[in-house]
């Protein structure tokens, strides 16, 4: 996908395709091409639909990692995924001023520091969250949004676990140079997550899923 155009419109098109295409289709490229065609009028980009569809096939065949060992997006069908989970949840009492003590992002940072092991990629994010730019911010009112997908996968204990998915099309590395695999190495991904505060997004989405 490195040769495809970037930007918000491209990201919205990819999100729409991943939201509506059936990953278990016998001909996945044809399924993805049809989905691109359906959404192209809303999110036009300078890329042929079949080229974008071909780029999205490997996305579906890439292992999901240790939280879903042996699985890819192609393996998880419509019955095991909830797409676009809309939510609205109260934060520390919602809009009832005085009904709950003030809770700030700095308090959330303290939780991260106390609960996450030192080797966890999100552990170091606590310092950024505790800083003057974010730390004093109060959690008050309501949080609304939409989670791109929730996946149900087998749990090693014999049950199921549920994974939060938020699709990203960010281009990492030097935008003036061709992309290389190292631009998306684990350390680079972790740095991008911290820089864009995606760690906080993931944490909030996990709370939403827990309440759901």
List PLM regions with ranges.
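Structural signature of nuclease core domains in nucleic-acid processing machines
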Residues: 1-212
């Amino acid at each position: 996908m490195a040769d495809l155009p970037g930007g918000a419109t491209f990201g919205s098109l990819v999100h729409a395709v991943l939201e509506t295409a059936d990953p278990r289709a016998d001909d996945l490229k044809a399924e993805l091409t049809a989905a691109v065609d359906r959404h192209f009028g809303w999110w036009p980009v300078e890329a042929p639909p079949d080229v974008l569809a071909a780029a999205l096939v490997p996305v579906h065949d890439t292992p999901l990692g240790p939280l879903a060992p042996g699985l890819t997006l192609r393996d998880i069908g419509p019955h095991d995924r909830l797409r676009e989970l809309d939510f609205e949840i109260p934060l520390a009492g919602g809009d009832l001023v005085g009904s709950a003590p003030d809770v700030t992002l700095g308090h959330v940072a303290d939780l991260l520091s106390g609960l996450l092991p030192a080797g966890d990629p999100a552990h170091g994010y606590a310092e950024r969250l505790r800083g003057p730019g974010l730390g004093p911010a109060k959690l008050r009112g309501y949080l609304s949004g939409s989670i791109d997908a929730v996946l149900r996968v087998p749990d090693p204990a014999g049950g199921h676990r549920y994974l939060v998915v938020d699709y990203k099309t960010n281009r990492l590395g030097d935008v003036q140079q061709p992309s290389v695999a190292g631009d998306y190495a684990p350390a680079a991904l972790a740095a991008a997550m911290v820089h864009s505060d995606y760690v906080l997004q993931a944490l909030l989405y996990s709370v939403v899923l827990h309440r759901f």
